[in-house]
């Protein structure tokens, strides 16, 4: 009763009311009610604003409820002035009410009600501050007394006033807030609940996330279920701000653009540091009271127990608010810099040739987005540590000095020395990190290239050597990672032990030299302070490594974004293309150029048809790039059409986007139905679209992989024609079309009104088709160009350009055969469905964990690792327990050792802890290394030996994600998270055991808290898993967009569609940020609840100790210290458990690939011994052959019977989908033989080892693939031949003119030798040169059986004739099967096989089949060939 009396006498301030008259008291109470009513009216007002209240049309922008608010505010003001009194507290209350009234009116009339909630909160906390004085007086009692003069009425009235005032403080915190879009261009169609929730939900509970938590508990969520991204976080806002504050330095740009956010983070960091000392102070005060209850009668111990309850929660509120703001800071950086990188891609020269001449690998750009952008975002950690570390260290040392006197200076000295340790090892960490990153990038680069060239790898049977190359890179990478990990472990262990050493030396000086008694209050408060220091040192150690990575990433991104800023001042604008003594190069510095066009002097007339011709490798495509402004002007002057003239460009290799055929043709232009179908017909697409189920709405994947080469080219042509541009540049558009389609397109496009009065520049080999309408001709030769009239062209170019056979006499435009292999999609793309699959179930998680441990080490090794975790945690707890015994020595009845013995015991325990902790970390790191090696070896082997059709249906980006993102998580994070979770489990168990031994009743609150934390953790985990999955699925489009842009950058810039692509990319970034933002936010949701719930543990421990007077203070301190650690361990355990689930999911995806069916497992037992030189004859016998691509699918070849004699030259022809390419693949066992057999020199190919089979039979594909390295490594990857032999093969493969080239710097005269560098994919060679090198590669093998799949499609007719002659001479002793698309190339073959729908139609010599006047005769007639 006395406590309640004291409460009323202190809290209600009854003495102030005693001097007031009754009417003044009533009016003040009435004033408070008006203020409270005013708040409720504002709440109604919010809903009126949000739903566009109908009364607004009568009252304008200010609705009726706002008028009511203003009237009530005036009444409140009048009532406040009536309360005229000289009392100071009455004046303060009146001023406070006037402030509320004035701000209410101001917010209503000028700023709108959106601001009101924040104003109310500010005033509410001001009023709350007045109340805290009385609350503190109550809790820090000296005596309980109560006396009221004036009766019970004067008691009830102020009580009602204070209740009203309390509600005035609380209610604004629960009001929802009004929302209006921040920017007009915001994509957000709905407000984020974060922007409309109450202040209480926003800051104190993160209750605005309850909806997504509940949805994820009930069902799988989709992106539409995720709360909208606040429109204040949209990419366009922050990209625009970065662009506005651009200082050509990324660091300066970030600081200027986010300065307000940085200042807020610094302010919150200071608050976080301040709240950290509340709990240690409460422990100290409580222990002092327990040591001597009569020492300070002015303080209530219940206050400090209450602080143990509320202190961790308030500290958590401030800390999580800081983390939330810092995560916003990070995501704003991620969004803006990602867009900056994309904008740089859009504005960089083709091939990304840097100023120094070096080429930036495209994988480099992907790494910038995947790693470096996130590393830069982690600068939030540096802001936090810069603001917090000095303050926390300084305050910790001040408290330590207050506790331990001058001995604390020793600890300060050690702290300074320890804090400088990261600086001393920074260079070492930087070097190791750089080496590890470089080795990882090299492995990813090699893996990427392998995926790009997987078809040629499997065709040539190169799996084993390619696997050896990858494993060699992998071994180097793992060794570097392990070295870095070991150094990091030793470094962090030293940083962790430093505060313990400092504590040991400080206690030794305090007790042995200064002669003081170490009391529990002093000891355990010091432990808390040293714990804060220890945390700072660990943080410094962690951040120092992050800082190194940050600097490296910042430099890389800065160099990319602001590097290569070359402005060609020599390029001017006019009405047409003009070259005046112009020299052009891919590089801005001519000394580093691989190729140049020199001394160009000509003008391309406007609105005329100009034909550009030249031999293979003469530089036609290079000139096309020059016209588009993609080359650098080295000397002279170049003039291009003004920006008002639109340019339409059709590249030689068609570029299409993910989307429908219609969207690819429209390409951002408005839909005009009449013109659209006119273009469709002109491009001969009408029949193709009619054959598709969805017509022009058929969805095509990246680069149109589901379309044939001719279809892709015609869609690309339709896109150009639909744009209705002023200038058209066509780069060899007829090479992918058959003769009939070429003629139709020539007539419907070039001879129609579609291209009338347009500037047309056509690069082509098909001179005879287009010359009749050409008004000008540009002839490319010897790295220069000459503009001539059509009449004089025959004097400058070979006569073969005009021969009757120069037409492309393709049998028919080749569609992709059913299930044929196509692997030209971008490596950045991956299936959303794959990434968005549900995480593994709980049971499968356990199984996956056990599978991982199988690769981690033996059972004994795993058991030893777990024991080391337990021993390290036990040794850590033993240190604190030893200090408890030491500090409570005088309070125990037992005979305990002297203080000197305690010091030695402390030192021994310290050494044991260091040894156990170091051993535990090294053991787990070594196990993680073993697991990484084993997993990658199995993964790479399984993927490399997978059937070719698996690569067809599996996106290349998905495979690359396994070897990069998922492998990185397994290499570095999975074992570390497993270790961290085990540490948390042991810490929780040991904490509960420690406190329970001292206070058995502690098990009750501990069990209750554990249950609550488990339920919250389970809800959190379900939501986090699904958000992580969504995040993965929404990240892929950003990389896919980048890949698409890189593939079609010249097309995008030519059509001037950069703005469309920029906005589309920003939309993708917003979609990527949305689940990531919520994912970070629900971490705050969990942390603030876990801290609040776990605060019950410290509160329960303190309350039990206070109520039970028989527990020694030393053990109470030990229990409290353990209980506070329990809070942290519980939260870390929940997060570690979620991390384990995430990283186990990464391992699950790897494990799925580790179980792929392997071609290597197929039978390789020979039915009879095989000659090492097999096949010696090249005799092929096919008997009753029926094949399909996989089990359960329809047959693609049926009942084929052939007898191919040694050295015979067989041509395989047929219409689209007839099975020509399938026949070639069957000989190499890329299909499944359902019945029949194929024998080579009498041996069934099913009985042969696949690698042997594919190494002995050569298939030259239509699409030549070169691997980075040199010409030598491409011809002879296993180094089996000498230079002399390889040079002879180069000459034989029609490359003699290239090998014997002069020093002229031209592409057709550029000296190719064995050491000539080859870029990835051979991009530094023309398509014709790549095809010639691919032919030379086949010649090196000297195979007895050679399969040619239209291997001359990318060369001009002159080169084609030379290659055909070379093939006849080089393979005269070999059996040749030519899959032909041009009749003219096979008329002199021994036999022709005509296929139709997978069946044999005709088989015999060309002349005999021609005389039969059947299928082959019709093909010859269509190609205008007579035999």
Curated annotation (Swiss-Prot):
InterPro entries: AAA+_ATPase, ABC1_TM_dom, ABC1_TM_sf, ABC_transporter-like_ATP-bd, ABC_transporter-like_CS, ABC_transporter_C-like, P-loop_NTPase. ATP 2 binds at residues 1214-1221. SMART domains: AAA. Residues 262-549, 862-1142 form the ABC transmembrane type-1 domain. CDD domains: ABC_6TM_VMR1_D1_like, ABC_6TM_VMR1_D2_like, ABCC_MRP_domain1, ABCC_MRP_domain2. GO terms for molecular function: ABC-type transporter activity; ATP binding; ATP hydrolysis activity; ATPase-coupled transmembrane transporter activity. Glycans are attached at residues 49, 437, 567, 581, 601, 658, 703, 782, 842, 994, 1161, 1184, 1324. The chain crosses the membrane at residues 26-46, 63-83, 87-107, 115-135, 155-175, 197-217, 262-282, 298-318, 345-367, 397-417, 489-509, 513-533, 609-629, 760-780, 866-886, 896-916, 973-993, 995-1015, 1086-1106, 1114-1134, 1223-1243. ATP 1 binds at residues 614-621. It is a multi-pass membrane protein. Gene3D superfamilies: ABC transporter type 1, transmembrane domain, P-loop containing nucleotide triphosphate hydrolases. Residues 579-807, 1180-1422 form the ABC transporter domain. Keywords: ATP-binding, Glycoprotein, Membrane, Nucleotide-binding, Repeat, Transmembrane, Transmembrane helix, Transport. It is found in: Membrane. Its main location: membrane. GO terms for cellular component: endoplasmic reticulum; membrane. Coiled coil: none annotated. The keyword Transcription regulation does not apply. One of its GO terms (biological process) is transmembrane transport. Belongs to the ABC transporter superfamily. ABCC family. Conjugate transporter (TC 3.A.1.208) subfamily. PANTHER family: ATP-BINDING CASSETTE SUB-FAMILY C, ATP-BINDING CASSETTE TRANSPORTER ABC1. This is ATP-binding cassette transporter abc1. It comes from Schizosaccharomyces pombe (strain 972 / ATCC 24843) (Fission yeast).
